[in-house]
Amino acid sequence: MKVKVLTLLGLAVSLVEGAATRAIDLSDEVQRNVQPKFVQPSFACNVEDGEWADGRWCYRFRITQSWNGSLPQWPSVNLKPSVTDWTPYDRFVVDVFNDSTGGDVLCGFISQPDGRLQNGLNPKSLPLNDYGYSRWVIDLRKWPKETDPKRIGRVHFFFTTPSSADVHLAGFHLLKPGEPLPPVSAKFMEEKVRPAEVRAENLRKERRRQTLERFIGRCRAAGQTGEHAWIGQATSMQKVRPRDDFDVAAASRFSLKLARGEYESLQVLVMPNGHDLANVTVEAKVEGIDPRAIRTSLVGYVKTINPPPYKGAVNVATNLPGGYYRKTQSLPTGWWPDPILDWVGTTDVKGDDLQGFWVRMKCPDDQRAGRYSGTIVVKGEGWQKTFPLSVRIYDFAVPKKSPLPLAITFSPGPHTQFATDEDLALAKKLHADPLSPINAWRKHEMEWGDFLADHYLTMDSLYHGGLKGIHWDVLMRLKKQERLGLFNLGYWTYPADMEPKTLEEWRANVHARFDAPYAKAKELGILDHAYLYGCDEISPKFFPNIAYALDELKKYYPGVPLFTTAYDHDFGTGESKLTKMDWFTPTTVKYAENFAKVAPSRAAGHQVWWYIACGPHAPYANMFVEYTGIEARQLMGAQTVKWRPEGFLYYQISIWNSLRPISGSNPFTDWEPRSWTRYHGDGSWFCCGPDGRPCATIRMENFRDGLEDLAYAQEYERRTGRACEVPVEVCRDINQFSDDPQVYYAWRDGVAEAIEKAAATSCRH
């Protein structure tokens, strides 16, 4: 019998028969009757009988209506345990059967009968798969100090913005140290789990059949015969999964529009029609443009194994302004497009895989504005298909360095924060291995510096300790290239208390860390690019200590901005104690919530940036592997134009847990997409390619494209003297924006047309 056992917080167990205490015994009529039973507008809860994991009874918690923005975000229920003293036990085991499509995440708290629920034990959440069974093993060895494990009175289950979960909870076993897991009913496995697995597989097959039927129908309508292959096309803002659902156009004619110095890309998609395809390539040529300006590469794929602790979003039509609403939905596991294999241009395509090719153009700086014609040729052994390609070059240029100040960490390393024992063992192994990605990149440091600058990034770190943490050679190279952005002199914090000895030690540490990089930056003539970042996400109770640090740092390092993500949402105004802070950085959510305070803060001489990290989740924009490329482009482009942050911060782009860099020509890579905890791509925006060289991703291409769109808006404002507007069709709110590339392009191209029109008007006058 195969049973999925989810082990949380590093507590290893095995499935063998043994005794256990039930915290909630649903076989007891009295205990059944004290459990809540209710029906809400979006969810329902009740005790239910039948054959479950360990007996007749279960507790059913089902979502009856998907969250849509107006329903409760946190449907929840409190179960009442009959056992109140949990101190003898080290594990709590819940058998979970989801009789619905997956993607929702089951969360919980275990707390006392009174007081704040959130002070209870909060185990790692349980992602739900399609129609499946999991055993949720919760570690009870570390209780929060606010919770007395001798007085447990609530076992709280909840979902966040759920879609379709229908969970049957059973077991509720408490295990003492050394006690094995209880057995799982063979009848339950046979009557419930196996049929559910069949339903899940049939659902996947039917979705795939409908996807292929739709795509092939579009190809036929576009005039394709299907001889050898079906050819599709997509923008750079789309993520097209090779073996799962997709929705793309048939290839007919391709186009690119870009300014001088700008990058812009498109995707060509190839699917066999009945027979595997060998040595498939895509070639793009444009008459009158240097062939070296256009490059075709293979789209690579990474495989996610476990559902992530976040949802995605898809826009649905509504009568709201702009005509859309972003609805959250579950994210399937499997193969996702992400790395762009610039060292590979040819591949075999098998079965009904839909293989992507990334066609990227960088417009030469001296290219004449105008319209150009070319072709995209898709070919394999014994066949070839040709499609027209049009290119329009706008009569202006994007800047060499980022149009928005950035503070972003590139410091390759494995995941170690909130790490399990397995994570820490892997980290130790990677650090010791000279061929691991976190070490292999170092011999190509200058190449990485150029590569990052190609994406508007400067090699930097928010958290380094001073002189040795700064890549001085890279910085000076970028200065010479006129591409140098901002860099950090080092991470600072506040004194723990105001005792004289503490303050003396704090000041000594500050001088030891920052005096040398300050002097060197000044000597090299790049001090005007420097900042000092500190007090990462610190709560207000420490603001008096931070205020002291600000006074001292201002004296020691004049001219260097002091920068934080501390939780001052007054941004240095009103009752704020951080009036000496130069740059404040709230999350995108807090920036929008406190937008009325931004202008007063700027009037007082501060800057207000924004940032994302492991949050916010959908419907907000973020950079996870599963999120569409347009989210990164919206965030750095249209949303930045609309909301006007003065900079963007991100904590890390190179958390790499892979054993080896990506190499070879197989698009289905073995790169590990899991980065921070159970997230896919959080803190990890690039991959490491052959021999430690850079490997781009679709996410980072869209990050740069968004900044180039921002440069369009800035050029428009410079030429016209008017603010560049973002219509509601493109972006209505911080969490409501279009996911349609054509809508986005219409706005961006309209800005370009207005720039050229303003230039023509200026010339006439």
Q: Where on the chain are the PLM-derived regions?
A:
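Catalytic domains of carbohydrate-active enzymes that cleave complex glycans
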Residues: 204, 462, 473, 494-499, ...
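Contiguous beta-strand segments within globular domains
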Residues: 86-91, 251-274, 356
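Hydrophobic h-region of N-terminal signal peptides that target proteins for export
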Residues: 9-19
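Beta-rich carbohydrate-recognition modules and glycan-binding surfaces
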Residues: 2-6, 19-196
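Substrate-binding cleft of secreted/luminal carbohydrate-active enzymes
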Residues: 628-676
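Surface-exposed binding patches on compact interaction domains or structured appendages
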Residues: 206-250, 274-359, 367
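Active-site clefts of carbohydrate-active enzymes
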Residues: 603-634
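Aromatic-lined carbohydrate-binding surfaces of glycoside hydrolases
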Residues: 271, 306, 317, 328-348, ...
